[in-house]
Amino acid sequence: MSWSDIINNNLIGSGNVSKAAILGFDGAVWAKSDNFNISVEEAVAAGKAFTSLDALLGTGLRLEGQKFLVLNADNDRIIGKQGGSGFFIYKTIQAVIISIYEKGLQPEMCSKTTGALADYFRSIKY
């Protein structure tokens, strides 16, 4: 199964996630949903976000040109919100998984779906 298949089947296909990406800690995009227009700068910032959690709480994070307020950030998960949409970024051993939910989707289900994939990645040491 390819990285794109994982994005499309496990995240987008769940109906709980609007847009998603899997990145390396350096911001290299391993795969993303076709509708996720993440810039290189945004990918690098997301990939490195877990190295400066306190600063992130004060400055927020940009995705697709929109600034999101960071509501919570710990060593495993970052939660952001902007209007009726938001994101969850989960850290695994070798990657970060970004999931965005848009208006009409349940934030809790987006988090649960993304967290389950992150748990699976950790279980296989990825």
UniProtKB/Swiss-Prot annotation:
Keywords: Actin-binding, Cytoplasm, Cytoskeleton
Disulfide bonds: none
UniProt GO MF annotations: actin monomer binding
Entry superkingdom: Eukaryota
GO cellular component, as recorded: cell cortex; cytoskeleton; striated muscle dense body
Keyword Cytoplasm carried by entry: yes
Any one biological process term the GO annotation gives: muscle thin filament assembly
A Pfam family matched in the record: Profilin
Protein's cellular compartments: Cytoplasm, Cytoskeleton
Tissue distribution of the protein: In embryos, expression is specifically detected in body wall muscle cells. In adults, expression is localized to a striking dot-like fashion in body wall muscle.
Gene3D superfamilies: Dynein light chain 2a, cytoplasmic
Stated role: Binds to actin and affects the structure of the cytoskeleton. At high concentrations, profilin prevents the polymerization of actin, whereas it enhances it at low concentrations. By binding to PIP2, it inhibits the formation of IP3 and DG. Also binds to poly(L-proline) and phosphatidylinositol 4,5-bisphosphate micelles.
Record text on subunit structure and interactions: Occurs in many kinds of cells as a complex with monomeric actin in a 1:1 ratio.
Family: Belongs to the profilin family.
Name of the featured protein: Profilin-3
Organism: Caenorhabditis elegans
